[in-house]
């Protein structure tokens, strides 16, 4: 059982007020729900304001863990205020050969980071710092942590996106771009919420319903439901593309500049969908047996949307770590027990992401 924390940050809040360097996101780079929060942080130019602490890629029976702190940990402080919390492999566009990487590998800022805030070794410790009588048995990411009060503000990725988008940290941002991207524009909020209501259960969670199915009948039902909804999204994006094609007389550059899920603007709808789709061919097709089609070969408009975000928006490209994505799923203890006993990480597909 997991417990949700639903706090927010605002100038009028009695406890959680905006402050530079006070709050941190704890998460796992391979986790799609953490990825949402990291994307929002980067797109809102909040890296200098909001720290990011990323765990080791393996989730074992005790949950997420962090690496031991190095000698003179203070000299690494700036790394936690970068797009990927200092993890080096996020700059690679291709996963490496991972067969000789053991689960106890502890390469600093490669396999994960240490915790510079509370110096904990397990994410569970953060939950118990927040509440010594924490009633849950699961310790989920992402976590938005207040280092001043040593309390969890929020651990729901969707809420964290909206907190970061609210403008509460804008006064601390130097970049003129901070007000350009509104991830939840007022005129699209109803459409965004409507989109979330089917994308979240049918696609974001749908891949897990397929991959963790415990009998063939359930698997077949869930995999068909998943692909029906991928096709639904394909139709949405096809319609968007055709409309843009007419508007811009086939000018590909202008089309791609407006090619998003909703309203010709980059919104929360794109942020919620991207982490699932970027992981699809790389992990879900083979590991979760979501194998009726691949994105690259079976959904041309969805695939174009994906590679457009990856190659044309640095925030998407440099928060996507194919090494961590593969290791996170393949070496997860529940995967070893139920899906891939020997934890063998597939080399393919190649490339991990097609060129635009």
Swiss-Prot record:
It is found in: Peroxisome. Its main location: other. GO terms for biological process: glutathione metabolic process. It holds the Pfam family GST_C_2. GO terms for molecular function: glutathione dehydrogenase (ascorbate) activity; glutathione transferase activity. It catalyses: RX + glutathione = an S-substituted glutathione + a halide anion + H(+); L-dehydroascorbate + 2 glutathione = glutathione disulfide + L-ascorbate. InterPro entries: Glutathione-S-Trfase_C_sf (IPR036282), Glutathione_S-Trfase_N (IPR004045), GST_Omega-like_C (IPR047047), GST_Omega/GSH (IPR016639), Thioredoxin-like_sf (IPR036249). Active as '1-Cys' thiol transferase against beta-hydroxyethyl disulfide (HED), as dehydroascorbate reductase and as dimethylarsinic acid reductase, while not active against the standard GST substrate 1-chloro-2,4-dinitrobenzene (CDNB). This is Glutathione S-transferase omega-like 1. It comes from Saccharomyces cerevisiae (strain ATCC 204508 / S288c).
């Amino acid at each position: 059982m997991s417990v949700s924390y639903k706090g927010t940050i605002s100038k009028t809040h009695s406890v959680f007020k905006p402050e530079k360097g006070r709050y941190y996101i704890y998460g796992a780079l391979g986790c799609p729900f953490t990825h949402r929060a990291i994307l929002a942080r980067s797109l809102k130019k909040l890296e200098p304001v909001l720290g990011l602490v990323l765990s080791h890629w393996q989730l074992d029976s005790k949950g997420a863990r962090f690496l031991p702190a190095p000698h003179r940990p203070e000299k690494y402080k700036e790394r936690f205020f970068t797009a990927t919390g200092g993890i080096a492999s996020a700059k690679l566009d291709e996963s490496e050969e991972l067969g000789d990487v053991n689960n106890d590998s502890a390469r600093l800022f490669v396999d994960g980071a240490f915790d510079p805030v509370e110096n904990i070794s397990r994410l569970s410790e953060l939950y118990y710092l927040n509440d010594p009588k924490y009633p849950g048995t699961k310790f989920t990411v992402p976590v938005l942590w207040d280092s001043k009060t040593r309390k969890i503000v929020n651990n729901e990725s969707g809420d964290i996106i909206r907190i970061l988008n609210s403008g509460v940290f804008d006064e601390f941002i130097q970049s003129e771009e901070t007000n350009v991207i509104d991830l939840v524009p007022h005129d699209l909020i109803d459409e965004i919420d409507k989109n979330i209501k089917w994308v979240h259960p049918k696609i974001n969670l749908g891949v897990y319903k397929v991959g963790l199915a415990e009998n063939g009948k359930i698997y077949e039902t869930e995999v068909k439901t998943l692909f029906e909804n991928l096709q639904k999204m394909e139709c949405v994006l096809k319609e968007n593309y055709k409309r843009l094609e007419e508007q811009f007389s086939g000018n590909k550059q202008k089309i791609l500049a407006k090619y998003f899920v909703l309203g010709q603007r980059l919104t929360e709808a794109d942020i919620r969908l991207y982490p699932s789709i970027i992981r699809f061919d790389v992990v879900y097709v083979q590991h979760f047996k979501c194998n009726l089609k691949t994105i690259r070969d079976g959904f041309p408009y969805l695939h174009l949307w994906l590679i457009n975000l990856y190659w044309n928006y640095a925030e998407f490209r440099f928060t996507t770590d194919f090494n961590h994505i593969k290791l996170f799923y393949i070496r997860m203890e529940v995967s070893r027990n139920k899906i891939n006993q020997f934890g063998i990480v597939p080399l393919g597909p190649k490339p991990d992401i097609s060129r635009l």
